[in-house]
A protein has these predicted regions:
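Short-chain dehydrogenase/reductase
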Residues: 1-2, 34-46, 75-76, 109
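Active-site Tyr-X1-5-Lys
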Residues: 1-28, 46-55
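Short alpha-helix within the catalytic core of nucleotide-sugar-dependent glycosyltransferases
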Residues: 9, 45, 83, 87
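Flexible, glycine-rich beta-alpha linker
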Residues: 15-43, 66-71
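C-terminal substrate-binding subdomain of Rossmann-fold SDR/epimerase-dehydratase oxidoreductases
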Residues: 50-177
Length: 177
């Protein structure tokens, strides 16, 4: 991703494009037709679903970060909002040639423990967890600044409610994993 982005930046006078930098994509489409799936990775929401479905113990990687509850904070953008951003960007670039880079997120975040608690609440279950070591080079807080994308594309977030993200993820993932 970085190599391609650097190539585009280097050639921005010759290429018309919009670069969309995703933050943490979450949720599934409203008709529950598709969702993100991988057997291995660092996707918190998917890993919580695995822990819930398989009754595994979930590892919280560190609780001594300089955050409100000691766990890392991330900006989660719902996949439906991200799809709308893509449509708006495509319409815009068809009308005029330019080069823009946008952060795709909401401008606020949730900690690992906040997400875990929401999963426990909405699943009516209790994901067992242990506190593990910090991940090497983990970013403490990663939150997008969406001002440019809101202004330029006239985008308005519609699905930034954490309840919607968690409930839709639970419905889809627990059926498909």
């Amino acid at each position: 991703k970085l190599k391609l982005e650097n190539f585009l930046i280097k050639n921005k006078k010759k290429i018309s494009c919009i670069i969309l930098r995703y933050f943490n994509v979450a949720g599934v489409d409203k008709k529950l037709r598709c969702g993100f799936y991988t057997k291995k990775g660092s996707n918190l929401i998917l890993n919580l679903c695995f822990a819930l479905k398989k009754k595994n113990i979930f590892t919280v990687n560190g609780n001594d970060y300089e955050t409100r509850d000691g766990t890392p904070i991330r900006d989660y953008i719902h996949v439906q909002d991200l799809a709308e951003i893509h449509l708006l960007a495509a319409k815009k670039i068809l009308k005029k040639n330019f080069f823009k880079i946008f952060n795709c997120g909401y401008g606020h975040g949730y900690s690992v423990m906040e997400i875990l608690k929401k999963f426990n609440f909405y699943s009516n279950s209790k994901i067992r967890y242990v506190i593990g070591k910090r991940r090497k080079n983990d970013i403490v807080i990663s939150i997008a600044d969406p001002k440019k994308i809101i202004q330029f594309l006239k985008w308005r977030p519609k699905h930034q409610n954490l309840e919607h993200v968690v409930k839709s993820s639970l419905k889809w993932y627990l059926k498909h994993i």
